[in-house]
Design a protein with these regions (language model features):
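Conserved N-terminal segment of class I S-adenosyl-L-methionine
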Residues: 1-108, 115, 127-132, 149, ...
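A short beta-strand submotif of the Rossmann-like class I SAM-dependent methyltransferase core
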Residues: 113-119
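A short His-aromatic
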Residues: 122-123
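Class I S-adenosylmethionine-dependent transferase superfamily signal
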Residues: 135
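Conserved beta-strand signature within the Rossmann-like core of class I S-adenosyl-L-methionine
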Residues: 140-149
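A structural motif corresponding to the C-terminal end of an alpha-helix
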Residues: 176-178
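C-terminal lobe and adjacent flexible extensions of AdoMet/dcAdoMet transferase-like proteins
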Residues: 204-205
Length: 205
C-alpha cells in the first residue's frame, strides 16, 4: 500500500486481520493461503508480457515478486508498509524495499513491466499526477494497473480515498504521455488482478 497519511496503519491488523479489525478487506494475507492464486497471476503475466525485469509497486509482502522471480524474471518490489516488508519471503527479501509510489527511487526506463495492483485508490488525489508520472518514468514498455473504480458496499477499507472511474485513470495516463491499450487479450475472470475489466488498465509507455 502507499501514501496513507499514517503509514503505520498498514500493520499486521491491516494485512492479516483486516476484516476482524475493520481496517481492510484482507483475511490472512499469507503465502500459504493465497500463494497458489498469485502463482497463476505470475504465469499469466509472463505469458502476455514476458518481462525481463519487473517492478511491483505496492507489493505488500512481495508475493508477486516471489512468483515472478521463481519463474526466471528479474523481479523487484516496493511498498510503504514496514510490517509487510518484514514479511517478504526470504528468497526475495533483498529485492523488495520500503518506499512510496509517488517517489520511486529507480532509474528512468529501468523496468520493462511495472505493475501496480490495488494501490492507486490509496493515493491522495493531489499526488495522483506525480505517482502516475513516476510509473511511466521508470517503465520502458508497460504499466499494468488494477485499481478500485467504484464504491462497493462491502469495502470497509478507510484508506480507499481516491476512487475514480476507469476512464478517469485512463485519461490521466494519456495526459502524462501513456497510451491506453486493449485488455481483451489479458482479461481473465479466473486470474487475480485480471478478473475485473472495469479495474484493469494496460498502459504502453
Amino acid at each position: 500500500m502507499a501514501n496513507c497519511s499514517d503509514l503505520s496503519f498498514y500493520d499486521q491488523d491491516y494485512f492479516d486481520r483486516g476484516c476482524q479489525s475493520g481496517k481492510s478487506n484482507y483475511v490472512d494475507y499469507s503465502w500459504e493461503r493465497i500463494g497458489g492464486e498469485v502463482e497463476k497471476t505470475a504465469v499469466h503475466i509472463i505469458k502476455h508480457f514476458a518481462p525481463a525485469k519487473s517492478l511491483d509497486v505496492g507489493c505488500a509482502k512481495g508475493f508477486i515478486v516471489k512468483a515472478l522471480y521463481d519463474r526466471g524474471v528479474d523481479a523487484y518490489g516496493i511498498d510503504a508498509s514496514e510490517y509487510a516488508i518484514l514479511k517478504v519471503p526470504e528468497e526475495v527479501s533483498d529485492r523488495v524495499k520500503l518506499g512510496l509510489a509517488s517517489d520511486l527511487t529507480y532509474k528512468s526506463n529501468e523496468f520493462d513491466l511495472v505493475t501496480i495492483f490495488d494501490v492507486l485508490e490509496h493515493i491522495p488525489e493531489e499526488l495522483t499526477d506525480q505517482t502516475c508520472a513516476e510509473l511511466l518514468r521508470i517503465s520502458s514498455n508497460w504499466v499494468l494497473v488494477y485499481v478500485v473504480t467504484r464504491h462497493e458496499p462491502d469495502d470497509i477499507d478507510p484508506t480507499h480515498i481516491n476512487i475514480k472511474p476507469r476512464e478517469w485513470w485512463e485519461a490521466k495516463f494519456v495526459e502524462l504521455g501513456g497510451k491506453i491499450c486493449s485488455i481483451n487479450d489479458i482479461y481473465n475472470p479466473n486470474i487475480w488482478w485480471f478478473n475485473l475489466a472495469d479495474r484493469l488498465i494496460r498502459v504502453k509507455k
